[in-house]
From Swiss-Prot:
Involved in the viral transport within, and between cells. The chain crosses the membrane at residues 30-50. This is Movement protein. Keywords: Host membrane, Membrane, Transmembrane, Transmembrane helix, Transport, Viral movement protein. GO terms for cellular component: host cell membrane; membrane. It is found in: Host membrane. Pfam families: Gemini_mov. Interacts with the capsid protein (CP). Part of a MP-CP-viral DNA complex. InterPro entries: Gemini_mov (IPR002621).
Length: 101
């Protein structure tokens, strides 16, 4: 081979190895990563939007947000939960009562 033609010939580069049948691992990795990201997005959407939307829709159906029932904690409306904020003993206003003294 003369030096003049050696300049214009391309070097031999090995071709890529033939692929075997089946799914490549890079494709499996992409699907796994995208599934994980989608799961995180759905969870954050639930935390930030859907949970509040469910509360609003239940409140619009006639229940206040304090009366929402989760699971088997149903309360009989004929016998509601007593109000615990009502004092059981008489309340004394203290030493500084207006109009006395």
């Amino acid at each position: 081979m003369d030096p003049q033609s050696a300049i214009y010939t391309l070097p031999r580069v090995p071709t890529a190895a033939p692929t075997t049948g089946g799914v490549s691992w890079s494709h499996v990795g992409e699907v796994a990563i995208l599934s994980f990201v989608a799961l995180i997005c759905i969870y954050l959407l639930y935390l930030w939007v859907l949970r509040d939307l469910i509360l609003v829709l239940k409140a619009r159906r006639g229940r206040s947000t304090e009366e929402l029932i989760f699971g088997s904690e149903a309360v009989d409306r004929r016998h509601p939960i007593p109000n615990t904020l009502v004092p059981t003993a008489p309340v004394h206003p203290g030493p500084f009562v207006p109009g006395q003294g």
